[in-house]
Amino acid sequence: MTNSFHPIPLLVFSDSYFLLLKYPVRFAKNERNVILQGEGYFSVRKNVDSRFTVQTPHHTQIQVLGTEFNVEAYEKEDEVNTTLVSGKVQFQYDSERGKKRMDLLPGEKITYNSISGEVFVSRAAVLSDISWKEGKIILYKTPIEKALRMLSKRFNVDFVITDPALKENSFTGTFIHQRLDRILEHFRISSGLRFRYIETTDSTQEKSKIEIY
């Protein structure tokens, strides 16, 4: 095998979702390694003789034999999230005492905070976590800050909440291939919040910014 990694160029889809995946030109017989930045869904055929590893930002990685799982790992964000749909994965991360490993079971989600070093395992909202694969956004009593984070990744925008009282809101709904304005209009009708695009003269700003007030 060759050790050189072949990068897929930064893929930006029509809904502004992006993914960067790197993989060897040829895999070794006993291991398959890829490097992920962004969010990806993996379906890996079981092969006990060839370990599959997804390397993610903040010195974390996921090892699998045969499974389906979702990974959300952005270099510019503090958290790495892995949701296990089926099979079994082992999540590895750095701690003060060295490398740590945790096994996940189907239906579980692990969240690692690279700043605090804390790790949380919880029951996953699997359908919501993998809904992006089909162009869906699924919310169920989702706090507004989490909902806006989902929209931020999907549509490549930044949100600013200027009314602290709005942080008490949560939303339920399924949106299929809908424009951002339509989704925010749903939020407005159900909660009374308002939104507007913030104009800027900064030509270096990569993302649009939206005020929630």
List PLM regions with ranges:
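A residue-level detector for the "anchor" residue at the start of short, highly conserved motifs
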Residues: 1-14, 18-213
